[in-house]
């Protein structure tokens, strides 16, 4: 089993179960089928911040600034980043960051994602603005 990103990064913050214990039981042959996978009543949204030109030609080595608030409903996963000798986070790949946020509905989750993305800066940052339009259109409050 492979837990891909951004899929796993989007789902894991919603889990209220000790997932490591369930994986350990599975790997050791002790999964008995009555384990509960509890999840939050919130929804989760993810948008990738990539380098301009990805997936073709893109430049790396640009300093990244993070000006966003901290919250348990915000996770920023580093994919294509590195840290230089001075401790500065740099862009170091095509898919640079995954910004994942939770909310009570898809609109609030995606609005928070785009707010956080607006507070992250590096030269050539690019992110799609049409992510999630399908669920935002098809799900109303309480339908998730």
Predicted regions and their residues:
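Generic C-terminus detector
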Residues: 81-85, 90-144
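Generic beta-strand/beta-sheet core signal
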Residues: 48-50, 79, 102
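Active-site "cap" helix and flanking loop/linker of ATP-utilizing ligase/carboxylase catalytic domains
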Residues: 1-73, 84
């Amino acid at each position: 089993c492979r837990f891909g990103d951004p899929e796993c990064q989007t789902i894991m913050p919603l889990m209220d179960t000790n997932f490591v214990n369930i994986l350990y039981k599975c790997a050791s042959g002790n999964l008995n089928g009555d384990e509960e996978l509890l999840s939050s009543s919130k929804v989760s949204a993810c948008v990738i911040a990539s380098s301009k030109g990805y997936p073709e030609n893109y430049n790396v080595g640009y300093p990244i600034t993070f000006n966003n608030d901290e919250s348990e409903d915000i996770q920023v996963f580093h994919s294509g980043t590195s840290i230089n000798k001075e401790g500065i986070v740099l862009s170091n790949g095509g898919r640079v960051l995954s910004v994942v946020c939770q909310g009570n509905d898809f609109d609030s989750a995606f609005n928070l994602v785009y707010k956080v993305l607006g507070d992250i800066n590096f030269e050539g940052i690019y992110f799609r603005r049409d992510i999630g339009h399908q669920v935002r259109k098809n799900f109303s409050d309480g339908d998730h």
